[in-house]
Amino acid sequence: MGERTDSGSASGFGMNPTLGGIGEGATLRQIFPRLPHAEAELLGPGDDAAVVRAPDGRFVVTTDMMIHGPDFRSAWSTPHDLGWKAAMSNLADVAAMGARPTALVVAIAAPLETPVDTLLGIADGFRDACDVAAPGCGVVGGDLSVSPTLTLAVTAFGDLEDRAPVTRTGARPGDVLAVAGDLGRAGAGLWLLFRDGVSPGAVTPGEPDRERAAATRGAHPELVDAQLAPVSPIASGIVAAEGGATAMLDVSDGLVLDARRIAEASEVALRLDPVMIEREAEALRTVDPVVGDRAARFVLAGGEDHALLATFPPDRPLPVGFRPLGTVIALTDAPDGRPDALVGDTPFDSRGGWDPYADWDGNAG
């Protein structure tokens, strides 16, 4: 889909001047020219609210947050990474509905000592992510505030262009389960960062180390980039909708967990083909052999790749860019009669994915 063009490094979090030093107005005057322009924009940043075209008469709307600690570490991510990832995760949610992303509203809360260059790098990340993954989408407004913890909150809008939305509820027995995009890379990248990108002598276990993380990224760019600045196949959302997708979501929390969400919403079970999962694992090992025998686990439970997982009628060819992973089966054919995601005929495990309330540890990540 394109290449990331990083405008900064993790050291961008330690440069001057600061937000507290120049204030909100001066900061915004530097940010606005760097933001991507939305083709649907009628009135953009600078007024009390934006005005955006809604030619379909409907809006697809989604919101996602990124908070320092559970969602990112400034020692690992560049400011550009943060803007890119915040944009991409929201664009993927819009795409998963079969819509075209049209506009973003961005709110950022940051400590007073945050360098202005950090905000400029974040803005550049939004610009580049939109340019690469969703041309024509841009930032139309937002808010800037003060907080002891750097936080990004993004609301994304999309246009269905007279199509029906693709929800999680439409999967039917016999449908083909398929995916567009990468699986397992982001999870493997996070594993590498916690393995190699931390300070071995820190008082707090798992304390991120900027230099070690940069070295890890340099040694394993395909995996660490996928974690810190993922590329989602945004255009494939419309392709899937026009190709007859019956259900769809983006894989943000892990293949098994997100497949289970389709199963529960559609009241079916999803059977992942072990042969196809091994194919995905082998592809991951080809990208970087460091994953070794962990590859299948990363494919099934890694999360944050923002691939698009969809179901399609069995009598139609899969759209370009999608590859099969399994099938949809009736609950009467599931081993325990419950909506679930199975690997063959076996449930993967009790969770098999990321839950921010259950899984985050302030030390271990």
Q: Whereabouts are the PLM-identified features?
A:
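Extreme N-terminal cap/leader segments of soluble proteins
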Residues: 1-78, 106, 124-134, 361-365
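Acidic, Ser/Thr/Pro-rich beta/coil linker or hinge segments at domain junctions
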Residues: 23, 230-231, 278, 318-365
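Glycine-rich anion-binding loops of enzyme active sites
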Residues: 55-59, 66, 101-196
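Short, acidic (Asp/Glu-rich) active-site segment that either coordinates a divalent metal cofactor
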Residues: 60-63, 166-239
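Small-aliphatic-rich amphipathic alpha-helix that forms the alpha element of a beta-alpha
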Residues: 79-104, 124-133, 238, 254-262
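Active-site-proximal betaalpha loop/short-helix elements
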Residues: 113-115, 221-303
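Short hydrophobic/aromatic beta-strand micro-patches
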Residues: 157, 309-313
